[in-house]
């Protein structure tokens, strides 16, 4: 029996060692969340996506080199041959081609392009003539082509530059969203941290309450043995003990629940055992509401984001107007072509003949100037412009509303901080008085001046005051954190949090 007990104790010890507890301060929790949480990873991926979207459009202004290889390209098919004054015949034709093409395209700053291109391939041709009893003809040819081409849209906006501007605005918005997301993470970690702290303190308060009720029950039994109180008083004290045990068990379960929520919030494995370290001391600071509003309007990224959104809508208006504008295009090309054909399939001879033909054959060349204008579209273009302008006006209204909302939020949070600060001082004093009052009640109970039921009420009152102080403390800390988030300003140090967040 003793050996079994020893084994059980050893197993419990090993289990406890394996489940090492990680103690976290608030600063450590924030640091983990800003690197490991789902939210920051999601914001990072979104920012990376927009950054690459911007880099893609930026790269549109750089040259590109393209190569296509078709080796082999083979096909056989029936081809209809129409004959004058006779019925058509259907010949079977086939080709086997091997080669490729290479092109170099230089993007002009004006949105056009200048391209150099070359094509070279060898092809074996076959034809089965229906009119000659499907007599088979074969030929081998080599084809070479070198040329230059030019294309330039005119009388319209540079769409490449416009797309780049749009991508840049989108990237700036994603960067702002990432920065705001960091501040939101800090605030949410603050909420989660103090929610876990509340659950931890509730366990401690309920443990203290249970110890007090056990002590009251012990004293009641001694009084009963001395025949100083009735047995009913002891039963009441015993009921208080059992009720406090139930409350303690419930608060322990709630603490574990809050631990899991907090671990998920900051990005820790749910299997990891954690506990928090906090200092319940708090400091106060002066808040100038005018400075708070000024800094919020300067630092809050929602205003910049609204301005970027307005610029995107301006681009939409320009695009809508182009549906009905005069457009033009200039294109030109010049190339030389060489063709070598012979029955001998010798590749070297074929290409020598093709290269010689480059100088013999006249070049291909051309230039085209086109204009297009929608004369009448039955209101489609006009409606699209009206839609884009309405969305632009809505974006302007949204920016104005955001500025008003920021001012209102700052005024409200400044009031909340001041109110919670005063309330915290009151509850702190109440807690000191309640502790003193309960100690006096314990002495009165020991002296027989009050009943166990009256002592239980005093104990309940002490717990309520302790929880009220805890809630007031947490409310104040959350209000201060919300003030930081909504002003992006450190009132203690007199500096902007925006610089600190961007440096990270």
What are these regions (language model features)?
Residues 24, 165-169, 175-295, 416, ...:
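Periplasmic alpha-helical coiled-coil/stalk elements that build and connect Gram-negative outer-membrane
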Residues 11-15:
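N-terminal signal peptide c-region/cleavage motif recognized by signal peptidases
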Residues 42-57, 181, 185-205, 222, ...:
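Amphipathic alpha-helical coiled-coil segments
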Residues 69-148, 277-286, 318, 331-373, ...:
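Small/polar, glycine/serine/threonine/aspartate-rich low-complexity segments that form flexible
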